[in-house]
């Protein structure tokens, strides 16, 4: 089933029906741009984050050179706070530059992002076809800062203003020296972080794709300036391979390099890893992850103050008195390289992806419809999520065929044994066919059924989700067989 023929409405309905994703505050009519992840959704997200953390941090071998990498490198983790010193956002440029342009329609009272007006529906048009705004009285574009403002302490006062972080990256930059001095590591090295970020999007849309509260998986990789281009190429290619390893088809992925006019003012190079989401038109892709070569912009900003581009150089922005408009910390964030006896400000390569977008892409990729015969041999349509076993919320389901003859007791014992290692589900209610269908829709790779033959020869039926093929496996061999098939 191709992405072009998949219905985003059906995928969203499945997510609600099977407990992947719920509208936040739904009993109060919901709140736009916020989503709750249900029992299966939270497991899917956790598996995505665990896979990322394992591949980026705990599974990294710092004693050998990975394929395609310029050299060995170290990798550590960090968890920084959601609310940080407000000066961080001024020095980084977010306070002045982190905004979208929006327009209001005086006719229909709707609000649109200025760069999405051609793809937005007009509420007053019966057809609601995107871009039909010829009769609308639109305002001139205005700036809208995307950071959520709050206050620290008991006083609502300008001096107490703070912001919910719009990205996790700045926490890693301001902790650069702390990590360097406490972790016995040297450049090149990376700092990885998974955490919540917040952006007050003007028009959140397309299910969970554009949300106001979301989780990011970001890594800041610090390297010497002369090797930064090679590291940028390495991380750009490696991150594409990671998505393929989780089950996204290469045909549905695209690596798009930004042109010079599209890049941020600090960027030395940026590439987006994009996915062909079903809610987009054929041939269109939506961003999954950005990989940016940020140069020395971030560490210099937090040393010197907010930087602006002056020709080919980044210089500190000055006020009318010649002082930094938004001062940095004044701390020395440069690095002394013992091997070369040189001092420099490290360059940064940043792969930054979204947990929610990754989960959404995996759900879209996995969604399929086919027909399989029921107990009487009559073809029945089914919905199945062909999730990669590594990120499937439930790894296996255990069923007794009937609720008698000792089958529930044997099934429960198998369930308890497997649960020590994996997330396993037990179900003894309803017909076996309906139990299979529920697990197919939940993305469970394997179902284990205890039946009459189990009593005789201590074997069970192991059913494959994708092929529906069933094989007999000895109970004593079940854990090793399942581990091999799950690749875990």
Describe the role of every protein-language-model region:
Residues 1-488:
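NTP/phosphate- and nucleic-acid-binding module
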């Amino acid at each position: 089933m191709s992405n072009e023929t998949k219905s985003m409405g059906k995928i969203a309905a499945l997510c609600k029906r099977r407990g992947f994703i719920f509208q936040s505050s739904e009993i109060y009519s919901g709140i736009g741009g916020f989503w709750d992840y249900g029992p299966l959704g939270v497991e899917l997200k956790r598996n995505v984050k665990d896979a990322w953390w394992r591949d980026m941090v705990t599974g990294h071998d710092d004693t050998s050179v990975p394929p395609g990498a310029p050299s060995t490198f170290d990798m550590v983790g960090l968890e920084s706070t959601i609310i940080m010193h407000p000066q961080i956002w001024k020095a980084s440029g977010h306070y002045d530059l982190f905004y979208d342009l929006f327009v209001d329609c005086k006719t229909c009272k709707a609000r649109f992002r200025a760069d999405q007006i051609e793809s937005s529906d007009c509420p007053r048009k019966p057809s609601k076809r995107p871009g039909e705004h010829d009769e609308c009285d639109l305002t001139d574009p205005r700036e809208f800062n995307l950071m959520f403002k709050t206050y620290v302490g008991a006083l609502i006062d300008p001096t107490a203003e703070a912001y919910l972080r719009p990205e996790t990256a700045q926490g890693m930059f301001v902790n650069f020296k702390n990590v360097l001095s406490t972790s016995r590591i040297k450049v090149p090295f990376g700092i990885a972080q998974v955490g919540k970020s917040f952006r007050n999007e003007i028009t959140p849309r397309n299910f969970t794709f554009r949300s106001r509260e979301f989780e990011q998986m970001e890594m800041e990789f610090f390297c010497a300036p002369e090797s930064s281009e090679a590291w940028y190429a390495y991380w750009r290619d490696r991150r594409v391979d990671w998505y393929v390893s989780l089950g996204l088809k290469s045909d549905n992925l695209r690596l798009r390099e930004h042109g010079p006019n599209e890049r941020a003012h600090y960027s030395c190079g940026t590439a987006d890893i994009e996915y062909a989401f079903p809610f987009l038109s054929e041939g269109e892709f939506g961003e999954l992850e950005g990989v940016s070569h940020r140069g020395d912009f971030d560490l210099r900003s937090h040393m010197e103050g907010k930087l602006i581009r002056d020709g080919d150089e980044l210089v500190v922005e000055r006020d009318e008195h010649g002082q930094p408009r938004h001062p940095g910390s004044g701390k020395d964030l440069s690095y002394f390289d013992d091997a070369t006896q040189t001092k420099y400000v490290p360059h940064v390569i940043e792969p930054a992806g979204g947990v929610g977008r990754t989960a959404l892409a995996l759900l879209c990729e996995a969604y399929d419809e086919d027909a399989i015969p029921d107990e009487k041999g009559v073809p029945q349509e089914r919905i199945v999520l062909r999730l990669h076993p590594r990120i499937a919320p439930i790894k296996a389901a255990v069923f007794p065929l009937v609720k008698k003859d000792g089958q529930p007791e044997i099934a429960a014992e198998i369930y308890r044994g497997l649960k020590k290692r994996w997330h396993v589900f037990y179900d003894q209610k309803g017909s076996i066919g309906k139990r299979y269908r529920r697990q197919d829709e939940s993305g469970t790779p394997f179902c284990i059924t205890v039946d009459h033959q189990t009593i005789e020869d201590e074997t069970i039926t192991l059913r494959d989700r994708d092929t529906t093929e069933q094989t007999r496996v000895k109970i004593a061999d079940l854990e090793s067989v399942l581990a091999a098939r799950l690749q875990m």
